[in-house]
Amino acid sequence: MPREIKEIKDFLVTARRKDAKSVKIKKNAENVKFKVRCSRFLYTLVITDKEKAEKLKQSLPPGLQVKEVKKTNEKL
């Protein structure tokens, strides 16, 4: 089940939970999406500022598996 988080502070609290398994970072032209997988929900945070996204990426917990997903060209 997906859930959206609006605040960066709430996202960091969620990422530090013990049931958080991994974080996927999806980069677009206009925004960056951080998706943290917990046991029940997939929490998503959308950031439009690239500098804030880099700061958030560096402040993620070190024990968490971080995976960066690049945009693929599905329609050619």
Swiss-Prot record:
Record flagged with keyword Ribonucleoprotein: yes
InterPro entries reported in the protein's UniProt record: Ribosomal_eL38, Ribosomal_eL38_sf
A molecular-function term among this protein's GO annotations: structural constituent of ribosome
The organism's place on the tree of life at top rank: Eukaryota
GO cellular component, one term: cytosolic large ribosomal subunit
Gene3D superfamilies the UniProt entry points to: 3.30.720.90
Keywords attached to this entry: Ribonucleoprotein, Ribosomal protein
Keyword field contains Ribosomal protein: yes
GO BP term (any one): protein-RNA complex assembly
UniProt similarity note: Belongs to the eukaryotic ribosomal protein eL38 family.
Stated name of the protein: Large ribosomal subunit protein eL38
Organism field: Lysiphlebus testaceipes (Greenbugs aphid parastoid)
Gene that this polypeptide is encoded by: RpL38
